[in-house]
C-alpha cells in the first residue's frame, strides 16, 4: 500500500491503513512531513507556522481523537480568547470558548446569537459527523442536519443582516465565513461562519505546542508505530515508481492529471473541470512588543479577524473574486505566542495572511504586505513601529513550496457553490479514482479545506472496503 503526500490527509490515511494491518509506504516530495501543516524557524529563535496556524477543526477532529495524537507528542494550547474581531470606534467582538459568554457581549443580538448557535454548540459532535464527510450519503444525524441546514443555506451576508441588528455579531459571522475566500453573498457561505464559530465556542481555536508541524509529526509517529515507512525527498511522477498494488494520492486534481497513471476517461474529465480559488499572501512579523491593539481585549485573542464590518469584508472578498486587490483586504492574524510561549525566545511573533486574486501580480514587491500592515495598524495604532523584521510569502511562493497549493489556493480548490459540497465532482465514490487501485485523499475531496484529516480517513475507509 502506497500513499503519495505526507500532509495531514495523506498521513491520516496512512495511519489508519497501517493500524488496519496494511504495510504502508508514504512518499513525500519535500524534505519533511507536513504539507501545508508545517512549521520552521523563520527568525532566530522563533518558530512560525508555514501554513495553517489555529486549529478549530483539528482539536475537534473525530479521526485525530481516534488516533490519540496526544500520545504521540501533540499538545493543544488554548489562548484566553479564541477569536476577536476589532471594529472602528467600538469594542471588539469576542468569541469565547463558551456560548453564553459570547452571546452576553453582543448587546441586542444576545438572544438571536443563542437561538442560532445553541443546537450547533451543544450537539457539535453530531453536526461534525454530518458535515465532515461526503454529502451524497444518508446523514448519520438527520435531525441535526436539518437544524443546521436551514440557516446554513443562506449567504453569510443575508443571514448576518436578517438575524442580527448590530455590527459585532454580524462581524463574527462574516469573519469566520470569509476563511473560505468566497464572496459572502454566495449561497452556503453562512455555513462556514456558523460552524467555525460553533467550534470555537465548543472546543476552542487552539494552536499546537511548538508549531503546527507537531500535528503532522504526531501523525507520522502513528504511522511508524504501526510499521509504516515514510520516505522523504521522493518525487513521484509515475505510479510505476511505487511498489504497491493500491495507491492513495494526497494530491489535488492538477497534480493527479500530471502523473503517469491510468484512469478512466470520465474520471479524467471530472478532474479537468476542477476549479481553483483565489490565492493567499502570508506575512510573518517579528515585533519588539505585543501588538498595540486599540481594544486591549484583542491582545488576549489567539486569532484576530481584521477587516471591519460584514459589508466591508464582503466588498473585500468580492473584489478578490473579481480579480482586483482591495485597498482594505480581509486579514487573518494569529498570535500563537499567547498560548504557546515556546514559539519565540525573544520578541513577539505575529502570523498574518490575506486573500489575493487568482494569478495576481503585485504592482511592486511588498505592495500587499503594505496593505496588510495598514489594516492591522488601523486597529492597532503604532503597530508599524513595533516591526523588527517581516517575511512575506506570495501566492506563487506558496505553490513553489507546496505544489498542492495551486496559485496559492490553500483550500485545494474553490469552495464556491456546489464544488464546496461535491468534491472533486458529482458522484457516490468521491475518494475512488480507479477501484481497487487509485484513491484520492486531499482537500479536493469531502469535507474540503481544513486540518482535520477527515479526507484521509474516508479514503482509508474506501481502501479497506475494497480490499
Region spans (language model):
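Hydrophobic anchor at the start of a short beta-strand
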Residues: 22-24, 247, 283, 385
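A conserved FAD-binding loop/helix module that cradles the flavin
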Residues: 52, 441-464
Amino acid at each position: 500500500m502506497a500513499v503519495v503526500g505526507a500532509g495531514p490527509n495523506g498521513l491520516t490515511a496512512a495511519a489508519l491503513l497501517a493500524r488496519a494491518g496494511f504495510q504502508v509506504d508514504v512518499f513525500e516530495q519535500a524534505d519533511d512531513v507536513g504539507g501545508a501543516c508545517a512549521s520552521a524557524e523563520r527568525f532566530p529563535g522563533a518558530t512560525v507556522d508555514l501554513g495553517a496556524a489555529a486549529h478549530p477543526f483539528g482539536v475537534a477532529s473525530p479521526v485525530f481523537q481516534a488516533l490519540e495524537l496526544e500520545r504521540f507528542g501533540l499538545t493543544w494550547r488554548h489562548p484566553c480568547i479564541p477569536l476577536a474581531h476589532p471594529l472602528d470606534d467600538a469594542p471588539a467582538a469576542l468569541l469565547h470558548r463558551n456560548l453564553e459568554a459570547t452571546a452576553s457581549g453582543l448587546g441586542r443580538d444576545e438572544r438571536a446569537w443563542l437561538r442560532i448557535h445553541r443546537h450547533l454548540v451543544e450537539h457539535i459532535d453530531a453536526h461534525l459527523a454530518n458535515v465532515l464527510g461526503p454529502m451524497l450519503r444518508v446523514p448519520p444525524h438527520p435531525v441535526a442536519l436539518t437544524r443546521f441546514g436551514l440557516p446554513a443555506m443562506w449567504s453569510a451576508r443575508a443571514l448576518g443582516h436578517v438575524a442580527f441588528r448590530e455590527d459585532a455579531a454580524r462581524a463574527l459571522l462574516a469573519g469566520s465565513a470569509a476563511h473560505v475566500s468566497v464572496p459572502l453573498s454566495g449561497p452556503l457561505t453562512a455555513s462556514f461562519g456558523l460552524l467555525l464559530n460553533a467550534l470555537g465556542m465548543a472546543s476552542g481555536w487552539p494552536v499546537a505546542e511548538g508549531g503546527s508541524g507537531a500535528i503532522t509529526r504526531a501523525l507520522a509517529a502513528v504511522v511508524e508505530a504501526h510499521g509504516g515507512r515514510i520516505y522523504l525527498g521522493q518525487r513521484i511522477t509515475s505510479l510505476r515508481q511505487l511498489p504497491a498494488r493500491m495507491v492513495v494520492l494526497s494530491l489535488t486534481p492538477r497534480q493527479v492529471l500530471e502523473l503517469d497513471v491510468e484512469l478512466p476517461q470520465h474520471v479524467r474529465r471530472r478532474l479537468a473541470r476542477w476549479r481553483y480559488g483565489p490565492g493567499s499572501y502570508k506575512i510573518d512579523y517579528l515585533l519588539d512588543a505585543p501588538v498595540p491593539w486599540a481594544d486591549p481585549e484583542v491582545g488576549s485573542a489567539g486569532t484576530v479577524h481584521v477587516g471591519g464590518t460584514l459589508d466591508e469584508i464582503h466588498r473585500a472578498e468580492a473584489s478578490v473574486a473579481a480579480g482586483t486587490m482591495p485597498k482594505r483586504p480581509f486579514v487573518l492574524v494569529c498570535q500563537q505566542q499567547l498560548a504557546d510561549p515556546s514559539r519565540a525566545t525573544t520578541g513577539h511573533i505575529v502570523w498574518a495572511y490575506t486573500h489575493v486574486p487568482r494569478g495576481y501580480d503585485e504592482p511592486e514587491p511588498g505592495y500587499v504586505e503594505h496593505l496588510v500592515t495598514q489594516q492591522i495598524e488601523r486597529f492597532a495604532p503604532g503597530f508599524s513601529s513595533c516591526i523588527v523584521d517581516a517575511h512575506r510569502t506570495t501566492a506563487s511562493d506558496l505553490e513553489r513550496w507546496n505544489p498542492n497549493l495551486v496559485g496559492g489556493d490553500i483550500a485545494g480548490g474553490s469552495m464556491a457553490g456546489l464544488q464546496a459540497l461535491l468534491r472533486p465532482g458529482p458522484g457516490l465514490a468521491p475518494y475512488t479514482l480507479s477501484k481497487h487501485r487509485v484513491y484520492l485523499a486531499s482537500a479536493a475531496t469531502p469535507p474540503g479545506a481544513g486540518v482535520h484529516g477527515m479526507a484521509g480517513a474516508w479514503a482509508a475507509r474506501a481502501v479497506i472496503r475494497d480490499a
